[in-house]
Swiss-Prot record:
Protein name, per record: 2-aminoethylphosphonate--pyruvate transaminase
UniProt organism field: Burkholderia pseudomallei (strain K96243)
GO terms classed as biological process: organic phosphonate catabolic process
Record key words, sorted: Aminotransferase, Pyridoxal phosphate, Pyruvate, Transferase
Enzyme Commission designation: 2.6.1.37
N6-(pyridoxal phosphate)lysine: residues carrying this PTM: K193
HAMAP family noted in UniProt: PhnW_aminotrans_5 (MF_01376)
Family: Belongs to the class-V pyridoxal-phosphate-dependent aminotransferase family. PhnW subfamily.
Cofactor needs: pyridoxal 5'-phosphate
Disulfide bridge partners, by residue number: none
Reaction(s) catalysed (UniProt annotation): (2-aminoethyl)phosphonate + pyruvate = phosphonoacetaldehyde + L-alanine
Keyword Transferase set for record: yes
Length: 369
């Protein structure tokens, strides 16, 4: 018998539905009118989910979410700008690394890995340095599962007259975001996260006026969002070979997203998954890294067992043998591992994951204390 697909307890790629996978069985011509309509419908729905309205446009881009982050920063941020980067994890640090490579001045505002970015501290930083023109914020720092207070920070940026660019890679579709109401300049996410598509397409939902002002600014040909959007407006086509099957899967995933009840229902299911997971893991003796007030219901970081018998590779393999795939830790201050709560999963799968983890502890002789 063929091996059953493992359940991915990761923040993307993730376990997808049969309907989403089946959508990839058809081949599409990248210049065909039917595929152009598919692109248009997906982009319209992404703007709708973001609460963007007519003032915003969606620019899809081939590649991972990081491709879209770099494309957005390289296109929207002028070379003489100065960007504030609140930093409480690896994905915030990645934004700083991109800005460094682009030659754009930036200031990192450090926070602990378990500390949400403070809107008050950001306000103070903007008040101290009038040269700061933009804030680049990670909404949900996936290295810990930490939720940053987007609405409060957006209000500070609006009051200070600074542009706000949001990496919503692991929050878009699961958490409420009101793009136009928050006056955000750009929001970035990807197909293979909380929308429950497959990896391979990033996208930016950008204020139309900001994008139109960015002609010729990007130092890259392939990552130029302005040129990508302008070409799509003229031709209804992608500039370069599109990820046709990825887009078709995302169309199917979006249909299921709306059938489920949109963001409120998706977020509620993930919250149930998260609560089921945390309760079960605590019963085994594990403790979450984050305080519950800072924890997003997308991925949970747990402290690793202190027992010398614990080693993540063997622990991972034992859980994998039981049909579940964990995610390694990505923190600098503690030995941890991560368990995702997203994908085409419910509370039953989370209970199964807890049982698999308990079985791994027993089989490896790991004592929890």
């Amino acid at each position: 018998m063929p091996e059953r697909d493992p359940i991915l307890l990761t923040p993307g790629p993730l376990t997808t539905s049969r309907m989403t996978r089946d959508a990839m069985l058809r081949d599409w011509g990248s210049w065909d009118a039917a595929f152009n309509r598919l692109t248009k419908s997906v982009c319209a729905d992404l703007v709708r989910i973001a609460g963007g309205g007519d003032a915003y446009v969606c620019v899809p881009l081939q590649g991972s979410g990081t491709f879209a982050v770099e494309a957005t920063l390289g296109t929207l941020v002028p070379r003489d700008a100065r960007v504030l980067v609140p930093n409480n994890g690896a994905y915030c640090a990645r934004i700083a690394a991109i800005l460094r490579r682009l030659g754009i001045a930036h200031v990192e505002l450090p926070f602990a890995e378990d500390e949400p970015a403070s809107a008050h501290a950001i306000d103070a930083a903007l008040a101290r340095d009038a040269r700061l023109t933009h804030v680049a914020l990670v909404h949900l720092e996936t290295s810990a599962g930490l939720l940053n207070p987007l609405d409060d920070i957006a209000a500070v940026c609006r009051a200070r007259g600074r542009a706000l660019i949001v990496d919503a890679m692991s929050s878009f579709g699961a958490l409420p975001i009101a793009l136009a109401a928050s006056d955000i300049d750009a929001l970035i996410s990807a197909s293979g996260k909380c929308l429950e598509g497959v990896p391979g397409m990033g996208f930016a939902i950008v204020r139309r006026s900001a994008l139109e002002a960015a002609e010729g600014r990007s130092p890259s040909v392939a990552l130029d969002l302005h040129d990508q959007y302008a070409y799509m407006q003229r031709t209804s086509q992608w500039r370069f070979t599109p990820p046709t099957h990825v887009l078709a899967a995302l169309r199917a995933a979006l249909d299921q997203f709306f059938d489920e009840g949109g963001q409120p229902a998706r977020g509620a299911r993930y919250a149930r998954n998260c609560a089921t997971l945390v309760d079960g893991m605590r019963a085994l003796g594990f403790e979450p890294f984050l305080d519950a007030r800072a924890q997003a219901s997308v991925i949970v970081t747990f402290y690793a067992p202190a027992d010398p018998a614990y080693a993540f590779p063997a622990f991972y393999a034992a859980v994998r043998d039981a049909g579940y795939v964990l995610y390694p830790g990505k923190l600098t201050t503690a030995d941890t591992f991560r368990v995702g709560c997203i994908g085409a999963l419910g509370a039953d799968e989370m209970r199964g994951a807890v049982a698999a983890i308990g079985g791994a502890l027993e089989s490896l002789g790991i004592a929890m204390r």
